[in-house]
Each structure stands twice: as structure tokens, then as C-alpha cells.
Regions:
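Bacterial N-terminal signal peptides that target proteins for export
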Residues: 1-6
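C-terminal motif of bacterial Sec signal peptides marking the signal peptidase cleavage site
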Residues: 13-16
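Terminal connector regions
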Residues: 21-24, 101-149, 180-181, 201-215
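Post-signal peptide N-terminal segment of mature Sec-exported envelope proteins
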Residues: 24-46
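Asparagine-centered strand-capping/turn motif at beta-strand->loop junctions
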Residues: 60-64, 154-158
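Short beta-strand and strand-turn-strand segments in soluble, beta-rich domains
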Residues: 67-71, 78-88, 130-133, 173-182
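Intrinsically disordered, low-complexity Pro/Gly/Ser/Thr-rich segments with frequent PxxP/GP/PP motifs
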Residues: 84-111, 178-203
Length: 215
């Protein structure tokens, strides 16, 4: 019994030390922010939280061989380069050699009719200690008329029920981001659920990924 308690104490101490150790920073050379930043004004949020706001769609690539947790922010600017609004920062997990599409919303949740571009900056980038408990598997994309459809399985590999924000990124033939729809998925421990997103007219590529997770 004493031996078992000693081992348990060692494991708890090791886990606590692991949490206390600062996360490794990602070298700037290991990240690439997309040159195409698309400005949109549309409905954001769900149900009673839905509202019209201006946002910027931009891709970030993890060029390294390890996962990265990346936070982007920025400002909206008018045709003269003057700031007309700030963008709320967003954090996403990016797999090795992977890409994620960010949707940075005006931090006052307001339409900005004068906004024609955005200046994007990296607010933070670290190497996560663990893989996320919810992941995407069996991703498929196919053409449906003048758009594409993306499907996948959302898999909870943990022993606890989770709630995950599942998103999709759709791009046009030139690689510009077009839309980033999302849905909130409650998913039980060890369960997988199908996800399906339909891209906008003119979309040629699409993919599904996981955003915020709460378990």
C-alpha cells in the first residue's frame, strides 16, 4: 500500500511540475500567415447571440513537425490605411505541417462598412503539451455542383463527455478563404459523431477541424 501511495504521489508531483513548466515558444520561422485576408460582414454567433459584425478570414500554416497553439489578432483598416476597428484574438491548435482558417471578429461586434483590409499579427504561439481530446478523422471533400461539401467523423478519445466547436474552412480556386461555418458538438466519452458542412458557391476546397473544447 505504501509503495502504491508513493507512486501515486510521484505521478501527481510530476503532473504538477509539468503544468508549472512554461510552454515552449514557437519560432516565428515555423509559422506562415496567409497573404490573402478576406473581409466580410455577416451574421456571427448562434441563436440569441447572433448579430451582424465585420470579421477577417485568414489562414495560418504550421511549418514545423510538431503541433502548435497559435493566437492571431489584428486591426481593421480603411482604404487609407487608418484603423477603423480592432479584431478579437482567436486561438487555434494547428497540427504539424497543417493549416487552420481563423475568423477574427470585430471586438465590439459591430459592422465596419469602411473596412477594406486588415493588419494581422501573431499574439502568441506555443507547443502544446498534449494532443486535444477531440479530433477529426475520416475527412472527405467532394464536388457538388458549383461548390464542395466536407464531411468527417468527430471523435472524442477521452474518458469524459466533451463539448467541441467544430468548424470548416472553405476556399476558392485561388486559395482565398471564403467562409468558416461552425457547429457546437456535445460528444460523449469514447464517442464519434458525423459532421457535414456545405461550402458556398465557388468553393473548390474545404476541410473540417476542431476549435474550442470543453470537457
Amino acid at each position: 500500500m505504501n509503495r502504491a501511495l508513493a507512486i501515486l504521489g510521484l505521478l501527481v508531483t510530476t503532473a504538477a511540475c509539468d503544468r508549472a513548466r512554461p510552454l515552449e515558444q514557437v519560432e516565428p520561422s515555423q509559422l506562415a500567415i496567409g497573404a490573402r485576408v478576406e473581409i466580410r460582414t455577416d451574421t456571427v454567433g448562434l441563436d440569441q447571440h447572433a448579430r451582424a459584425a465585420t470579421f477577417a478570414l485568414v489562414d495560418a500554416d504550421n511549418l514545423g513537425d510538431r503541433p502548435a497553439t497559435v493566437t492571431l489578432g489584428g486591426v481593421l483598416v480603411d482604404a487609407d490605411g487608418h484603423e477603423v476597428g480592432r479584431l478579437r484574438a482567436e486561438t487555434l491548435w494547428i497540427p504539424p505541417r497543417g493549416r487552420r482558417t481563423f475568423a477574427l471578429v470585430d471586438d465590439a461586434d459591430q459592422p465596419r462598412p469602411a473596412a477594406v483590409a486588415a493588419r494581422i499579427d501573431v499574439r502568441g504561439a506555443t507547443r502544446p503539451r498534449h494532443e486535444p481530446p477531440v479530433a477529426i478523422e475520416q475527412g472527405h471533400v467532394w464536388k457538388d455542383g458549383d461548390r464542395v461539401v466536407a464531411t468527417a467523423m468527430v471523435v472524442n478519445s477521452s474518458d469524459r463527455p466533451c463539448q467541441a466547436v467544430v468548424l470548416a474552412g472553405f476556399h476558392d480556386r485561388d486559395g482565398a478563404p471564403m467562409t468558416r461555418p461552425f457547429s457546437v458538438f456535445p460528444i460523449g466519452a469514447g464517442i464519434e459523431r458525423p459532421a457535414r458542412f456545405v461550402g458556398p458557391s465557388g468553393s473548390t476546397t474545404g476541410y473540417i477541424f476542431v476549435g474550442k473544447i470543453r470537457c
